Amino acid sequence: GLGDVYKRQKLDRFCQFAVVVSDQAFIDSGLVKEKINGDRAGVIWGSGIGGMKTFYSESVNFGTGNGTPRFNPFFIPKLISDIPAGHISIKYGFRGPNFTTVSACASSSHALIDAFYNIKWNKADLFIAGGSEACVLEPGIGGFNAMMALSTRNDDPKTASSPFDKDRDGFVLGEGGGALVLELSLIHI
């Protein structure tokens, strides 16, 4: 989980999702942290946007203030897309490959593919890989709406999200995260 309130306040929502789903995946794997060679374990995380809430709230606070350039010292660390991979690696003591894929809606898929290939190429034996996003707020909704990327089927929520339908008209914005534990013994190459 996220631990104490202090830690939650230091993490953007997209990073909170990442930590929680990584913990769930690790617990589900049945692995024991102390039995893992940290030098052969890594984290590859995907996020297309990163800490949008942090960027938005800090910018609004600055804009409505007296013009003094005073930002929270955690402003940049909270919003950069690769911060979840760092937090997860530190939590589990993983010192192997650690990076983030940023490729829009495919970021999480690319993270999983990169983890698979890093195992195949003998760069590591185990990865926590996945992705998270948290952009359901004014600039996220407004930005995707301005691009005309959101579904306009507001009258029927059951049909609004239809990505494979020939009559689709956009996507439904959501947030959350997902993670898998990939390990050498389960990949048959």
Q: What positions do the PLM features span?
A:
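Short, small-residue-biased leader/transition segments that mark boundaries at the very start
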Residues: 1-6, 189
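Acyl-thioester C-C bond-transforming condensing/cleaving domain
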Residues: 8, 27-37, 48-187
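N-terminal amphipathic, basic-rich helices that act as targeting or association modules
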Residues: 10-24
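Acidic/polar N-terminal loop/beta-strand segments that form early-domain functional surfaces
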Residues: 14, 46-48
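Conserved catalytic motifs of the protein kinase core domain
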Residues: 40
